[in-house]
Amino acid sequence: MTLQTFKSTDFEVFTVDGLEERMSAIKTNIHPKLEALGEQFAAYLSKQTDENFFYHVAKHARRKVNPPNDTWVAFSTNKRGYKMLPHFQIGLWGTHAFIYFGLIYECPQKVETAHAFLEHINDLKTNIPNDFVWSIDHTKPSVKLHKTLETNDLQKMIERLATVKKAELLVGIHISPEEFSAMTNEQFLAKIESTMQSLLPLYALCNR
């Protein structure tokens, strides 16, 4: 049986008012799909890397007043968490689905990873697909399209990862609700797989 992924109507969960109400809608409608994606792609990443990957569905446990504007499942090699490690994500905002690889501010490997990325910056500029996007803050939906960046722009983002304590850097794709409505489950799963394939060389640079 084909894994049931998101529907275009799932984006509407972020229009539900109130913390408890929105969290209830996320837990009912989104979390089961994130769990299923987590199982499938933790196994996929484990096979691709010969490492044990674990998945972590966002719980939003720290939220006491404001409801979440996005939700996700993350993949790392630590069974207890992902924020301290380079990791992959699949998730939703109200405006798009996303598939990312990156490092957020809690990760202690940021300086070493930034140096590795800088050493291979020309490869990154050339080999990352033009329709991929870069994010410097996982809590905001705004991104920069890879094809619009000069090598110098990319260099500045990577250098910031090394020099700014709260800096983050994620790269991957966005899929709009309109694009999503035209995709089958199989096409979405294939898109996740192809995106992760394009991002695995960056993961390898983090672990050289």
UniProtKB/Swiss-Prot annotation:
InterPro entries: UPF0637, UPF0637_domain_sf. Belongs to the UPF0637 family. This is UPF0637 protein BCAH187_A4079.
